[in-house]
Amino acid sequence: MEHRVFTIANFFSSNHDFITGFFVVLTAVLMFFISLGASRKMQMVPMGLQNVYESIISAILSVAKDIIGEELARKYFPLAGTIALYVFFSNMIGIIPGFESPTASWSFTLVLALIVFFYYHFEGIRVQGFFKYFAHFAGPVKWLAPFMFPIEIISHFSRIVSLSFRLFGNIKGDDMFLLIMLLLVPWAVPVAPFMVLFFMGILQAFVFMILTYVYLAGAVLTDEGH
């Protein structure tokens, strides 16, 4: 029988899927109200949460425009920015005792990876057209097309695995690290581990956001656009 750490969701059910879903919804609700608080009373000179959110948005767009250009960075920000913020909040909630990171569940990170996967292919087909988009999978050398096309297909599907497992593995490992530290030193406040987990939570959200933009750039930017 698999051993699970007790969380507040266990008051309602011990089912693994329920616990994951509980924290997925809880994270979304927390993110919604925090974001609402940041945008409720907008000021010309940003302060408090508004200042934090504007700094985050500026930082994301500053990095993204070097990948995909400023216009497309802003166009795809609603997806990439929302995913980045949600992944960040999901990572952070697991630091709180009695809570569990949704991103510590592979089933959830798989859903995020599939959203990115299907969306960038949809955008690539929409921008370039179905045949032109998939023609790129065959490569520039025609006689190599029978070899390159299946390799490219496998490469794109492997992105689902790499995106989901990278996030899941890192956050699951971080949660286990924190649990071990709390068990070894329950009488002390493990400030250093909390700081490490906070930094790792930011880093994983940043990596997921960057890869989202990289995949979108590969799908929508034609040779003429480079």
Curated annotation (Swiss-Prot):
Coiled coil: none
Gene Ontology biological process terms from the UniProt entry: proton motive force-driven plasma membrane ATP synthesis
Keyword Cell inner membrane tagged: yes
CC per GO annotation: plasma membrane; proton-transporting ATP synthase complex
Gene3D superfamilies: ATP synthase, F0 complex, subunit A (1.20.120.220)
Chain segments annotated as transmembrane: 18-38, 79-99, 105-125, 134-154, 179-199, 201-221
Topological type in the membrane: Multi-pass membrane protein
InterPro entries with a match to the protein in the record: ATP_syn_F0_a_bact/chloroplast (IPR045082), ATP_synth_F0_asu (IPR000568), ATP_synth_F0_asu_AS (IPR023011), F0_ATP_A_sf (IPR035908)
UniProt-annotated location(s): Cell inner membrane
GO molecular function, one term: proton-transporting ATP synthase activity, rotational mechanism
Record keywords, A-Z: ATP synthesis, Cell inner membrane, Cell membrane, CF(0), Hydrogen ion transport, Ion transport, Membrane, Transmembrane, Transmembrane helix, Transport
Principal subcellular localisation of the protein: membrane
One Pfam assignment: ATP-synt_A
Entry's family note: Belongs to the ATPase A chain family.
Subunit annotation: F-type ATPases have 2 components, CF(1) - the catalytic core - and CF(0) - the membrane proton channel. CF(1) has five subunits: alpha(3), beta(3), gamma(1), delta(1), epsilon(1). CF(0) has three main subunits: a(1), b(2) and c(9-12). The alpha and beta chains form an alternating ring which encloses part of the gamma chain. CF(1) is attached to CF(0) by a central stalk formed by the gamma and epsilon chains, while a peripheral stalk is formed by the delta and b chains.
Database matches in PANTHER family: ATP SYNTHASE SUBUNIT A, CHLOROPLASTIC
Physiological role: Key component of the proton channel; it plays a direct role in the translocation of protons across the membrane.
This protein's name: ATP synthase subunit a
Organism: Helicobacter pylori (strain P12)
